[in-house]
Amino acid sequence: MALRNVNRDFLLPMPVWDRAIRLFHWLLVLTIVIAYAGAWMHQPGLHRASGFCVLALLLFRIAWGFVGSDTARFAQFMKSPGAAWRQLADLPTRTPDRSVGHNAACGWMTVIILAALASTVGTGLARTAGQVTPHAQMAWILLGIIALHLAAILAYAAFKRQNLVRPMITGRKRLPGATPAPRMMNQALALALLLIAGAVSWAVSHWF
């Protein structure tokens, strides 16, 4: 703390992503890869199981977006479209992004990804009733959105020399010393929500 008072612009590693968000992110990556692999290898059982895992993770993330740590909350990172556009316009510059969590553009991307996941899962449930085409279409749309997400990560590395992947692994981001630390919620609450989400997804899997 004393160091922050010496130089308010000095960059210090600050916890920005809690364990729940990081675990959610990488489990989601894994289950999405398995879901697509199951579809391409014509393994419907694997595809279905991974799809319901995605549903559980999605339900958890939505809940954590309202009651979770500051940087996980929708209210913290959902800004106006104008703010997102200004953030995108600033992308080609060398000006470092000092957002504690998601900036405005990344916030919108997060919501778009969650919405695309929800649509893909929803059409997947409808697929069991014979509606195959919408699910396949959403799967391709989701791939496009994921590609855009990866392109943004590469753009930040190229233009701003910022690694967006490392903080999602370590939970820490280098920020000016005067930056207020975000509030982190008890991870036991996250575990309880994940278990509830898993139970709901399991129940849905027996309904469809």
Model-predicted regions and their roles:
Residues 1-208:
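Membrane-embedded alpha-helical bundles that constitute the cytochrome b-like, heme-associated redox core
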